[in-house]
Amino acid sequence: MTARLELGLETRAAPSAEAEARERRTILVPGVRIALLALANVIGLLAFLWPFVLPSVASHVAENHQGDGPWIVAALGAILLALLFLELGRGGLGPKTVALLGVLGAAMVALRLPGFVAGFSALFIVVLVAGNSLGPGFGFLLGCVGMFASGIFVGGLGPWLPFEMVAVGWVGAGAGLLPRGGSWRARIAWLAAFGFVSGYLYGLVMELWFWPFLTDGSALAWDPGGGAWMNVRHYLGFYVVDGLTWDTFRAVGNVVLVLAIGRPVLAALDRAARRMQLRVV
């Protein structure tokens, strides 16, 4: 009888220990995820900015990030893999999140295959609606993964790839920070407005990946010895000449797609998130 009681007590104690371990993982995993996402954003920001901070070093390396581009991709790839393994290791919600990420990433690849019409590509609608529905963390991760995968399929591998990954990831994160409450009309209006603005901001940021290496002394080039305000004027002039018209196609295209299919796609993602019990992060 004593043995049975002891066995019963041990059997009842086991679930308690398992529950405590599960609770510890529940507390730990979100913190690790946030730290990894923050690290990826910091790496992306430094990748864009370091030539401005260390112009003497930039002048001696291969132009247009041909020397450091692969290292940036490797660093971002390692962080993305860590995030995916973290989600898969959670159990329950994790694999569902990764599966949805894979489906939406494949959609981005399919929409990029036809190429760009001027600066517009329909892949941005996926990042915009997914980020808005599933949150800034998911939006950033999808932007990075989708651009990397699509770069492989369309032959877009080059020193520009890590900058595309980060820039599209920022578009998805920004969409996730928009208000989601209120009426559908307000939500779509916010998303359309952000799609328009992000169409220009994406191009404005992407031009920075190679502009610091244009040091030919022209009025549109980077001048390491010039002041900050002078270089801002140079860059804005360069952007107007090189990218403004191109990016207008993207901005207008984003608005058209959001207004045309934004609501049904958002509703489908919201419904999938509820059924799969995905948390907006």
Question: What does each of the following model-derived ranges do?
Answer:
Residues 8-23, 28-129:
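Hydrophobic transmembrane alpha-helices
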Residues 20-71, 157, 162, 180-281:
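Membrane-embedded alpha-helical hairpins and interfacial helices in multi-pass inner-membrane proteins
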Residues 81-91, 133-135, 174-182, 263-270:
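Structural signal for the C-terminal ends of transmembrane alpha-helices
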Residues 104-110, 133, 173, 196-205:
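Small-residue-rich segments of transmembrane alpha-helices in multi-pass membrane proteins
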Residues 109-124, 144-179, 189:
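Interfacial aromatic-anchored transmembrane helix boundaries in multi-pass membrane proteins
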